Design a protein with these regions (language model features):
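Extracellular/lumenal glycan-associated context and N-glycosylation machinery
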Residues: 1-79
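Exposed, interaction-prone extracellular/peripheral surfaces
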Residues: 1-23, 27, 190-192, 223-462
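An amphipathic, basic-hydrophobic helix/alpha-beta surface used to engage anionic
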Residues: 50-52, 60-312, 356-360, 374
C-alpha cells in the first residue's frame, strides 16, 4: 500500500484452517456445543426424540456459525490513508482506516487493532457495531514521534464475530504503510552571498559557451534563429549553417556536509548535539533550495545525495523538488558512522569547485581540523558550524576543552572558513545571522590572497 494514499488491504494467510476456526468458539458457543452434546447423549439413553432434536439444534448452531464465519470471512475490505506521510519530528500525523463489508451478509461485532511502533504511541483499538451488507465504516487515530526515522504502520488486525456471538476469528491484513519522521527544521534569515553569483535570491550564474572566437562550440541552425548569430567560419567548415550558442543559465551550487562520526558526538536523544546537527543540515538544505541553488547532501563517509546528475547535484528545478524529499528521507534515517575521519568527504570535494560549502562538524581533533581546512581550497565560500559535544553533555566547556575548541575554530578561520561555535540549545537562525556578520572579516582577509583555481563564489557571506 502506498504511503500517504488509500489502498486495499488483502487478507493474510489462515493458519490452522478449520481447527483454528473451532478454537475461536466463544464461551457462549462452547456452552451451546456442550449443552447440545449432553442433551443428545441424554436423549439417546432415555429414548427421548424431542430432547435429541433440541440437543442437535444446540450443537449445530455454533458449528454453523463457525463454518459461515470461516468460509465467508464476511469479505471485509480495508484501506489505510496517512495524512501526511512525511512529518517533522514532534508533529502529529493522522491515520484513517476505512472498512467495507462487500458481502451480502451483515457482520457482527468488528474489533480493529492497528500495529504501530510504541514510539508512535499506544496501539489503537476500535470496536465497530454491526456493518450492513455493502456498508462502510471509517475511524482515525493520531501518531506522533519526537524521534526521526521510518516507522511501519500495520498490519491491521481484524477480529470478527458472528451475529449470535458464538465464534470470534482474527484476520490480519498483509499491507502496511510507512510513516517518515524527518528532522525538525527552522526558517533561516536571508543572508546575501558575495561572489560572482547574480543574486542570493536567484542562486544562478551565467556560463558562456565560448571563451573566444576560436573556442566556439557551435550548433546547427534552427528555424527562427537570429541570422546575426551565424558563425561563418564553422558554416564553411561543416557545409551547413552553424550558429553561436547562447549563454547558458547555470544554477549556483551548494554542498551541505554533515559530520556523522560516532567519535565526534556525545550523548543521545532528541536534544543531543548530533540531532542538532542533523536538524541544522535539514534546515540549510531547504533554505538553499528555496533560494534556487542546486544542493546536495554529503556525509563524512563520502556518500552523496541525490547522487544523480553532474557531481551529484540536481539538474533542474523539478529535479530539485524530488531531491529535496530524497535528502530529507535520508536525514530521517541517518545514523552515526564508524569512521574516524573526514578524508572521504574531502576526496569528493577536491574533485573540483563545488560552489558554496556549508558544514556541520562535531568534535574535531588536530588532524581532522586540518582536513576540514583543506576542504576550503576547493569551495567558493565555506561556512562551518562546529559543535562542542562535551559542552552539550556537561552544559558548558571548561578550561582545556574550551581552549581546544577555540583553537580548532582559529585554524578553520585562518584557512578561509567562516566558523561558528555551536553551544547547547543555540538557535540555528541566530547562528546563521552571526555567520553573515563574521564573514565580513573572513572575506576581507581573503581579498588580499590568491584565489586562483576557484570560480563561482569567491567569498563567504556578506
Amino acid at each position: 500500500m502506498a504511503a500517504g494514499g488509500p489502498a486495499a488491504m488483502n487478507d493474510g494467510d489462515d493458519k490452522g484452517g478449520p481447527r483454528a476456526a473451532l478454537g475461536g468458539l466463544t464461551t457462549r458457543g462452547r456452552s451451546f456445543l456442550a449443552a447440545g452434546i449432553a442433551a443428545a447423549v441424554c436423549a439417546y439413553v432415555l429414548g427421548q426424540g424431542d430432547l435429541l432434536r433440541v440437543g442437535l439444534l444446540l450443537a449445530t448452531l455454533p458449528l454453523v456459525c463457525v463454518a459461515v464465519l470461516f468460509r465467508t470471512r464476511y469479505r471485509v475490505a480495508g484501506t489505510r490513508r496517512l495524512s501526511p506521510s512525511r512529518v517533522p519530528a514532534g508533529t502529529e500525523a493522522r491515520v484513517h482506516l476505512r472498512m467495507e463489508n462487500v458481502s451480502r451478509l451483515p457482520t457482527g461485532l468488528l474489533m480493529l487493532q492497528d500495529r504501530v511502533p510504541y514510539v508512535l504511541g499506544p496501539r489503537p483499538r476500535f470496536v465497530l457495531d454491526r456493518v450492513e451488507a455493502g456498508g462502510r465504516r471509517e475511524v482515525s487515530y493520531r501518531v506522533r514521534s519526537d524521534l526521526r526515522g521510518r516507522y511501519p504502520l500495520g498490519p491491521l488486525q481484524l477480529q470478527l464475530s458472528d451475529p449470535f456471538g458464538m465464534c470470534e476469528l482474527t484476520r490480519s491484513f498483509s499491507a502496511y504503510d510507512t510513516l517518515v519522521v524527518i528532522p525538525r527544521t527552522e526558517p533561516l534569515p536571508p543572508v546575501r552571498l558575495a561572489g560572482e553569483a547574480s543574486g542570493y535570491g536567484e542562486g544562478r550564474q551565467r556560463a558562456l559557451a565560448l571563451a573566444g572566437e576560436d573556442d566556439l562550440i557551435p550548433r546547427g541552425y534552427r528555424h527562427g534563429d537570429d541570422l546575426r548569430r551565424v558563425h561563418w567560419r564553422s558554416t564553411a567548415r561543416y557545409g551547413e549553417l552553424m550558429v553561436r550558442r547562447e549563454e547558458q543559465p547555470q544554477r549556483a551550487r551548494c554542498t551541505v556536509l554533515l559530520d556523522t562520526r560516532r567519535i565526534a558526538y556525545q550523548g543521545t536523544g532528541p536534544d543531543s548535539a548530533f540531532e542538532w546537527a542533523v536538524s541544522g543540515a535539514a534546515s540549510a538544505l531547504l533554505h538553499m533550495l528555496e533560494r534556487g541553488f542546486a544542493v546536495r547532501l554529503l556525509t563524512d563517509d563520502g556518500s552523496s545525495v541525490p547522487g544523480e546528475g553532474e557531481g551529484g547535484f540536481a539538474g533542474s528545478t523539478h529535479e530539485s523538488a524530488d531531491s529535496a524529499g530524497l535528502m530529507m528521507d535520508t536525514l530521517a534515517v541517518v545514523d552515526h558512522s564508524d569512521g574516524g575521519g573526514l578524508s572521504r568527504a574531502y576526496d569528493v570535494l577536491r574533485g573540483g569547485n563545488q560552489g558554496l560549502l556549508v558544514a556541520f562538524f562535531g568534535d574535531l581533533d588536530e588532524e581532522q581540523a586540518a582536513v576540514a581546512a583543506r576542504m576550503r581550497q576547493r569551495s567558493g565560500g565555506a561556512v562551518a558550524f562546529v559543535l562542542d559535544s562535551d559542552a552539550w553533555v556537561q552544559g558548558e566547556s571548561h578550561g582545556a576543552a574550551l581552549a581546544e575548541a577555540e583553537e580548532r575554530l582559529r585554524l578553520l578561520r585562518e584557512s578561509g572558513w567562516t566558523a561558528v561555535l555551536v553551544k547547547p540549545g543555540a538557535a540555528l537562525a541566530e547562528l546563521w545571522q552571526l555567520a553573515g556578520q563574521q564573514s565580513t572579516v573572513t572575506q576581507s582577509a581573503l581579498s588580499g590572497g590568491a584565489t586562483g583555481g576557484t570560480t563561482g563564489f569567491t567569498g563567504g557571506w556578506s
